[in-house]
Amino acid sequence: VGSSTDEWAANVPAEWIEQVLDYCDGFDNRYLFQSKNPARFLEYLDHPVMKKSVLCTTIETNRFYPDIMRNAPLSRERAIAMQEIANYGIPTYVTCEPLMKFDLKELVELVGMCSPQQVNIGRNSRYDITLPEPTANEVKMLKAELEKFTKVEIKANAYCWMR
């Protein structure tokens, strides 16, 4: 739900979120809400629409790149919030996009904390920004480790890593 914005960002008024959730609840649909601030989801876990929703966060690396990620909560904070959501019984997904240089064991641990039903892996799609990207072999190792506990989807823009 939503596009070009993070509906769950700290600066989004609670009334706006409540209006969106109430509106969505009026339809017999399944929803996917995604945020880099999943701790905000925790405030709404008892909203009726959550019974027919999947909650997703982005964990693009376990590392912190201050020039790139300055406004987003740390990856570990996101994973902790998603762990609480999963423990509450709400299905979760993780998107690793744009996937950046990572430490394999640490990233797998963070993603695993989220208990995701699916992980999507994608590359940077903004050509005006250069990001620290992993090698193809590193991504293949990540995919293999993640597949030990969840479904992994490789987005079309990341197929080059799978060759």
How does the language model describe each region?
Residues G2-E145:
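Conserved AdoMet/S-adenosylmethionine-binding subsite of the radical SAM
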Residues N137-R163:
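C-terminal accessory extensions appended to soluble enzyme cores
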